UniProtKB/Swiss-Prot annotation:
Protein name per UniProt: DNA replication and repair protein RecF
Keyword Ribosomal protein applies: no
Signal sequence interval, chain numbering: none
Keywords attached to this entry: ATP-binding, Cytoplasm, DNA damage, DNA repair, DNA replication, DNA-binding, Nucleotide-binding, SOS response
Chain's gene name: recF
Role summary: The RecF protein is involved in DNA metabolism; it is required for DNA replication and normal SOS inducibility. RecF binds preferentially to single-stranded, linear DNA. It also seems to bind ATP.
Gene Ontology CC annotations of this record: cytoplasm
Family designation: Belongs to the RecF family.
GO biological process: DNA replication; DNA synthesis involved in DNA repair; double-strand break repair; SOS response
Binding site residues for ATP: G30, K31, N32, G33, S34, G35, K36, T37
Length: 368
């Protein structure tokens, strides 16, 4: 659902920012430290309940304030906009509201406001640990399969309990086997959802990458976390003695990974930084496109667009995002790096950010 209105209070240097974004393209220009990225951070916070810049909530709550607040109105095809809000307290408490009523969890916001982030740290999707790529897959599986989150939570709980049991030591194989039934059932469900999602994502990724560049041939390979020739029950049974020795569960969905390959090896090892940026951008856009094809509009956040992409690829990236008919927020230090030829029918709004103050520079459809 596109953001119709956004109110931000006490997020970093944004004491009070209120504005009505375009349902299509929003460009925010400002110097480093001006607060432009904090606008994207606030939108991300409203969707995920956490920042993409820091895991420590106290770092983004404005100094001398007890909490930060992000409020938005979300467009609906029928009826009045939905009012959603999130308040993050300095003590860590999160208060989520939808239509004025307290929500049970941030997940209810994530369902209503899917957000995709493309920023300089997106390289971590290739460079980082498998856990980052699992998060990438799980975000998609969450939106693709309505039963995924319940299975994932149950499996995580069973895995944690099993590892606690293993750390205590002196456990028999028969007791562990009895305990493993729920772990295996839920783990297989999580694995099947992940596998199905990657299969759906792959052709979208290949197509998007080809639109960004014709110079790369990249494939996606899903590793489920154990031998593909075995089911999870067989893998867990074969590994019980080793698990007892190690004191933790060494095989299963918690070891899953998304392997990004070129013809000559891992994409991380064979591609330049600029090419890696294109691959990661294609992965993110493909995820969004798949969601849009399901009738689920989402918001793209593109922070520091010029970073590591030349003007030609920046133009292609923006044209591709524009073609998805999604709401887009783009930040840049220099105005000329986002001075593209948008479609005549695209509502582009340009904002300037100075010391936490946001001002509208231009609004409306592009001139012919």
């Amino acid at each position: 659902m596109p953001l119709v209105r956004l109110d931000i209070s006490h997020v970093r240097n944004l004491s009070s920012v209120r504005f009505e974004p375009s349902p299509q393209v929003n460009v925010i220009v400002g110097k480093n430290g001006s607060g432009k990225t904090s606008v994207l951070e606030a939108i991300h916070l409203l969707s995920f309940g956490r920042s993409f810049r820091s895991h420590k909530h106290k770092t983004y709550i404005q100094h001398e304030n007890d909490a930060c607040i992000v409020f938005a109105q979300l467009h609906q095809k029928q009826g009045s906009p939905i009012r959603v809000g999130l308040q993050r307290h300095r003590d860590g408490q999160i208060d989520v509201r939808i239509q004025g009523q307290r929500a049970q969890s941030v997940i209810e916001l994530a369902e209503r406001l899917p957000v995709q982030l493309i920023n300089p740290d997106a390289f971590r999707l290739l460079e980082g640990s498998p856990s980052i790529r699992r998060q990438f897959i799980d975000w998609g599986a969450f939106h693709f399969d309505k039963d995924f989150i319940q299975a994932w939570r149950g499996w995580q709980k069973a895995l944690k309990q099993r590892n606690t049991l293993l750390r205590r030591g002196k456990i028999s194989l028969s007791l562990l086997a009895a305990f493993d039934q729920e772990l295996i059932r839920l783990g297989e469900q999580v694995n099947q959802s992940r596998k199905a999602y990657v299969e759906k994502l792959t052709p979208h990724f290949v197509k998007v990458l080809s639109l960004l560049t014709t110079e790369l041939s990249v494939s996606l390979q899903f590793f489920q976390g154990w031998d593909a020739q075995k089911n999870l029950a067989m893998a867990v049974e074969a590994g019980r003695e080793r698990d007892i020795e190690l004191g933790y569960t060494h095989t299963g969905p918690q070891r899953a990974d998304l392997r990004v390959k070129t013809a000559t090896g891992d994409a991380l090892d064979t591609l330049s930084r600029g090419q890696q940026k294109l691959v990661v951008s294609a992965l993110k856009i493909a995820q969004g496109q798949l969601l849009i094809d399901m009738g689920r509009p989402l918001v793209f956040l593109v922070d520091d667009l010029p970073a590591e992409l030349d003007a030609n690829h920046r133009q292609k990236l923006c044209q591709l995002l524009e073609s998805l008919n999604s709401q887009i927020f783009i930040t840049s230090v220099e105005p000329d790096t986002t001075d593209f030829t948008w479609a005549d029918t695209t509502d582009v709004r340009q904002f300037s950010m100075t010391n936490g103050e946001l001002s509208l520079l231009s609004k409306g459809l592009q001139e012919s």
